[in-house]
């Protein structure tokens, strides 16, 4: 920004005594001299362009903010994927290494108004006064982003605060005149109940108007309008006069500059943090310091003014929250793998702060919940005990975010509550209960109708993280991503990291992946035909859904062979299940098992039927091919493990077929011993296990930990299948179902619904235990990426059987297939 007009009294930093001692390193976004075109200061994103991404080429053109014809766009796509992609990664990597904060005119103004102790006619922070003089926009306003020409309540509030600061020290008469003129021209916005408002605007803005009138300033607005705002302010205060909750007191302390002498300062200072601030907020701290001298509060403001060269952000410190938010964004959009070392450094530092109970984490509900979730899912040992203060709704309401009913905070704690790794985690379960109820109430509010926030809440409630596919989540987050990334607090808080870099890389990566997925799916469809599997009249033709489960989890470009191996194995398990369940004769089933036990190329006369020939040849050739590839990668024989797991699956299928033919009802325990294997997930996971780039020791599948993960995953899969398929199976005359067996074993004392409830408890316990094994001890013979395959399969099963048997219901998975594989991205905005 440039200095507008000569100051009336020369150099203000030199005029005022009491400047703070120099020191600190500047990490604030630099302020440029203001051009007349209102260009934004460096580091601040400008306007938005509506986009529709149709291809990698179109993605490149759109991310560049250009409208181009296809050939030109194709050329840009090639450039993005080669040079620009590296530049994007380098830019993001740099941003992860340090957080740069945007300046806050509102907070800087309140700090500028703090008088020098013992000299009420001089400011404690003349540097802030200078910054205000040098950073007015040419329309008379002060705001975080002058490129946004439309005034809003935040800009009005910031401008009035800056006017008050200049008037307090009797400088910048022309700046004051132009600021008041801006307020007068746009005052109707302050009267608009529907306009987005900063937190506490109804308290602080009328209070500033009163302060302006009391100091002799003539605000060019009707007195009736000022009286109306003051009346509304008084009504707000009176309405809450009987509320003595801690949450209310926190709110009043947060708005210390707006409540002023209405506050009991000894009580307000109970919210002071170790660094001397109130809520890490400069304006709150300055508001308190103007009425109640405190050395620690003064030192906090001095440190900020020195660190940022005369300007302050709206929150500080904010490093942990900002860095975790970036990590979360990278994970949510599917590009975290490119920044593994940087993310590890951030999480290591966060974990150290967690163990030290750093106030930046522990005193902020959102940061605490996000830190817990990211640390847990990345293998750090964190306890939900640190969330005990919000275990109940009353505890949350006692916080500032709770009093404000902050949507982001509620959503964050709700998502975190689903990351339990113990059967009876009362804290997380309680958080999930009250936060889920609160989110449902928010859905009924008109305030979030038609907003991305509503879609976020709906998605979180419908699909807990354990019933989602990664690539579906990535697409959803890319589409909903806010490239501006600002947050409205008392004033707008805008990160200076270039969120458009995140979005551009994610779009490029997703579009490239879709192209790969389409090619791989074409190969799989040819594989089905080449192996004559489409000629099996009894088999469900679901190769696309089988591929979806692989593509949406092992999604990285280099894992193409693992994806197709996963899909082919999953499809073969479905085909053979159909052979044993509905489509095959007993002789065909026995013949197939006998051929598998020999595991060699049979003669033509060894096949009982053409169907058996088609199935066995496809299985034999596919398993041997995958085994040879995996053995070469691992340096030892893997084929034997694949054959063994297939034999285990088919033997269990045969046992269940014999139960059905003889109308034998096994015990629930007998059924589960077979059922957790016969669904075939173990074979599917193993088909990719040796192909994802991790070295596994010989005999890994014989380890107790492997067997336990197999059992837990299989338990979830079988029981989820049984809950969703019981009505269909009973109508088909099939009695071997976990739900019906529990009802039978109860002797009539348990209803079907009660049995389903019991089964869901067992699923929940197994899922939590599985997650504990996946995110637990990092050392051991089974690398975490391999453990994660079991977890990802568990998530797939939860999604497929979320409401119905998705695998058996033709329309259930169509939208997921389209979103991951077929439909081009459509972005709302950049």
UniProtKB/Swiss-Prot annotation:
Keyword annotations: Lyase, Magnesium, Metal-binding, Plant defense
Binding site for Mg(2+) 1: 577, 581
InterPro entries: Isoprenoid_synthase_dom_sf, Terpene_cyclase_plant_C1, Terpene_synth_N, Terpene_synth_N_sf, Terpene_synthase-like, Terpene_synthase_metal-bd, Terpenoid_cyclase/PrenylTrfase
Motif range (DDXXD motif): 577-581
EC number: 4.2.3.28
Residue ranges, compositional bias (Polar residues): 23-37
Catalytic function, reaction form: ent-copalyl diphosphate = ent-cassa-12,15-diene + diphosphate
Cofactor requirement: Mg(2+)
Catalytic EC class: lyase
Region of interest: Disordered: 1-50
Inducing stimuli: By chitin oligosaccharide elicitor and UV irradiation.
Family statement: Belongs to the terpene synthase family.
Name the UniProt record assigns to this protein: Ent-cassa-12,15-diene synthase
Species lineage: Eukaryota, Viridiplantae, Streptophyta, Embryophyta, Tracheophyta
Primary gene name: KSL7
């Amino acid at each position: 920004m440039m200095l507008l007009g000569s100051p009336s009294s020369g150099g203000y930093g030199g005029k005022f005594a009491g400047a703070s001692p120099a020191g600190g390193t500047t990490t604030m976004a630099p302020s440029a001299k203001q051009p007349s075109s209102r260009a934004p200061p460096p580091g601040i994103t400008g306007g938005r362009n509506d986009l529709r991404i149709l291809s990698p080429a179109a993605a490149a053109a759109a991310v560049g903010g250009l409208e181009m014809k296809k050939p030109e766009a194709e050329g840009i796509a090639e450039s993005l994927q080669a040079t620009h992609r590296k530049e994007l990664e380098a830019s993001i990597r740099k941003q992860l290494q340090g957080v740069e904060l945007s300046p806050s005119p509102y907070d800087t103004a309140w700090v500028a108004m703090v008088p020098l102790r013992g000299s009420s006619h001089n400011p404690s922070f003349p540097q802030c006064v200078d910054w205000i003089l040098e950073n007015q926009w040419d329309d008379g306003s002060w705001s975080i982003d002058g490129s946004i020409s439309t005034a809003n309540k935040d800009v009005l509030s910031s401008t009035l605060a800056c006017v008050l600061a200049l008037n307090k020290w009797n400088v910048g008469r022309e700046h004051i005149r132009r600021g008041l003129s801006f307020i007068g021209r746009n005052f109707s916005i302050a009267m608009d109940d529907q306009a987005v408002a900063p937190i506490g605007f109804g308290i602080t803005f009328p209070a500033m108007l009163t302060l302006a009138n009391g100091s002799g300033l003539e605000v060019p607005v009707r007195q009736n309008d000022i009286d109306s705002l003051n009346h509304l302010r008084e009504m707000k205060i009176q309405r809450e006069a009987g509320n003595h909750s801690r949450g209310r007191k926190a709110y009043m302390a947060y708005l210390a500059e707006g409540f002023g002498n209405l506050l009991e300062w000894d009580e307000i200072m109970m919210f002071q943090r170790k660094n001397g601030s109130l809520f890490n907020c400069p304006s709150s701290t300055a508001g308190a310091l103007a009425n109640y001298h405190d050395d620690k509060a003064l030192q906090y403001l001095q440190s900020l003014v020195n660190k940022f060269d005369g300007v302050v952000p709206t929150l500080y410190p904010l490093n942990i929250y900002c860095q975790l938010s970036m990590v979360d964004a990278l994970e949510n959009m599917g590009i975290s793998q490119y920044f593994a070392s940087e993310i590890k450094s951030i999480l290591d530092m966060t974990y150290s702060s967690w163990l030290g109970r750093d106030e930046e984490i522990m005193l902020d509900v959102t940061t605490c919940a996000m830190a817990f979730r990211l640390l847990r899912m990345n293998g750090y040992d964190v306890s939900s005990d640190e969330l005990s203060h919000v275990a109940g709704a009353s505890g949350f309401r006692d916080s500032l975010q709770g009093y404000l009913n902050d949507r982001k905070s509620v959503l964050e704690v709700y998502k975190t509550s689903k990351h339990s790794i113990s059967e009876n985690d009362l804290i997380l379960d309680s958080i999930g209960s009250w936060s889920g109820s609160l989110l449902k109430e928010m859905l009924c509010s008109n305030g979030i109708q038609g907003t991305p926030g509503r879609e976020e809440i709906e998605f979180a409630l419908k699909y807990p993280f354990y019933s989602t596919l990664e690539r579906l989540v990535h697409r959803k987050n890319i589409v909903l991503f806010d490239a501006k990334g600002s947050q409205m607090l008392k004033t707008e808080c805008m990160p200076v990291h270039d969120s458009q870099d995140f979005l551009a890389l994610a779009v490029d990566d997703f579009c490239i992946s879709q192209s790969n997925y389409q090619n791989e799916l074409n190969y799989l469809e040819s594989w089905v035909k080449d192996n004559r599997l489409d000629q099996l009249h009894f088999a469900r033709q679901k190769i696309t859904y089988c591929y979806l489960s692989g593509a949406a989890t092992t999604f990285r470009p280099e894992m193409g062979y693992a994806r197709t191996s996963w899909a082919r194995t999953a499809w073969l398990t479905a085909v053979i299940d159909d052979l044993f369940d509905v489509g095959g004769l007993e002789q065909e089933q026995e013949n197939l098992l006998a051929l598998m036990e020999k595991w060699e190329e049979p003669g033509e006369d060894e096949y009982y039927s053409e169907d058996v020939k088609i199935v066995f040849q496809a299985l034999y050739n596919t398993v041997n091919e995958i085994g040879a590839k995996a053995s070469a990668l691992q340096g030892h024989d893997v084929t034997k493990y694949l054959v063994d797991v297939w034999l285990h699956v088919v033997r269990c299928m045969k046992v269940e077929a014999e139960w059905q033919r003889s109308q034998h009802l096994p015990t629930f325990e007998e059924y589960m011993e077979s059922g957790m294997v016969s669904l075939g997930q173990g074979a599917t996971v193993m088909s990719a296990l040796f192909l994802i780039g991790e070295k596994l020791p010989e005999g890994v599948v014989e380890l107790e930990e492997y067997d336990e993960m197999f059992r837990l995953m299989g338990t979830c899969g079988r029981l989820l299948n049984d809950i969703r398929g019981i009505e269909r199976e009973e109508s088909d005359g099939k009695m071997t179902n976990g739900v019906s067996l529990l009802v039978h074993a109860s002797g009539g004392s348990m209803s079907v619904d009660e049995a389903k409830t019991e089964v869901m408890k067992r699923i929940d316990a197994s899922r939590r235990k599985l997650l504990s094994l996946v995110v637990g001890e990092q050392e051991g013979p089974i690398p975490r990426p391999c453990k994660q395959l079991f977890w990802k399969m568990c998530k797939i099963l939860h999604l497929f059987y979320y409401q119905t048997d998705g695998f058996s219901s033709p329309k259930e998975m169509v939208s997921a297939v389209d979103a991951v594989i077929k439909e081009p991205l459509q972005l709302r905005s950049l």
